[in-house]
Amino acid sequence: MKIVFFSFCILQSYFSFCQSTTSFNAPVDTVVYAKQLDDSISLQIITPSIMQYSSGVSYPVIFLFDKQNEINYQYNLETIDYLTSLSAMPPCIIVGVAFENSTRNKWTTPNISGGKADDLISFLFEDISLLLKTKFPVANFTTLIGHSRTAIFSSYAQSKTYPLVNAVVASSTANFDFGDENTKKQFEFFINEIEKSRGQYFLTFSSGTSFQLDYHEASVDSFANYLNDLQIPGKLTIMHVKEPVDHFVIPGLTVNRALANIFASYRKAAIYSLEVIQGQQQNDSVPWRQYLSLYEEQSAYYGFKIVPDLLFYNSIASSYANDYDDVFKDKSSVLALEVLLKCVESYPFDYSTYLWVSEIYFEQKKYTTAIEFAEKGIAVLTDDKVITADEKLEINDEINDFMESIHQEMKK
């Protein structure tokens, strides 16, 4: 009963999750006047769906440039959703920024070179950042994702705003060979100061090839050669992506790899937690101190608080419940229950956790409590915005059958 029913719920959640970009709430479009630019900018604010169901968690910010290029923009959103769904990166607040063709070049060129990039930086990192902090729990970690002109801007903004921009994904960039001495000096200032900072920094840049009509290859190669001659600080991770593709294809090949690389350590805590349980000898308690210390270590690395996610709770609870090495014996379900109850506290929106808790109480013959958690699971399922109505009906039928089994046992 337990394996069949719980597996059904997990599969339902998984397949529903894969149908659309489900890690995020519906986007909110707005137009904001930027006094620094004496112009208006179209923004799209997208928040992670998990935000409304958890507490004590802050979320990194991603500025995703070139919303006006809908194909690349949507692809990048789906890439972020994909990695978030797999817990390969933390849930983030996304700010999509659109540029008019008439202003894109000027706004991405430094003021000292006749542009307004410094004014755009002021708008984004003073006005918009303040707005986000007043409305959402924002973590001290910011990523910029740009292509071509906005990639140039992203790279410049990282060195100009130090220490505000932690990561840059710059696809098919030009002028990385520093077209002017001022930009070069700004970057070298960033390089020299970065070791004093808290947390880690990342710079990813890429190009296609001239043969494939990406004419930024030479400038990107020049920048890569320049970096090879520098003493790169340990706090700065550099990634150079080069593929035999054109100017418009390279962003799709860059963003996925860059984000996976930037947040590679984010997933380590969950993975190392499985090693803890595999080496666990005591069968009377959950070693929370060991688990949490892994998350504290990754938090120190990135410079913002990272907490156990659903992947952690489900993986650890499954390991206890299944007791693969026969270590926990009759305590296995007790330990699994402790983990799941902690999960319910942290993520009260996940209906399947309530149902799993209900099944454990059922096995322990605590029928009233089992019914209580099953009913809570139904209530959460009813409010779920992702699972379709037909799927909810099917899952509800399974839950009702399960609850009928509980009532039958209570009559014996």
Predicted regions and their residues:
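Non-catalytic cap/lid and distal C-terminal segments of serine-dependent acyl enzymes
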Residues: 19-411
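In a subset of proteins, long, contiguous C-terminal domains/tails are tracked
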Residues: 1, 5-8, 404-412
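Bacterial Sec-dependent N-terminal signal peptides
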Residues: 1-24
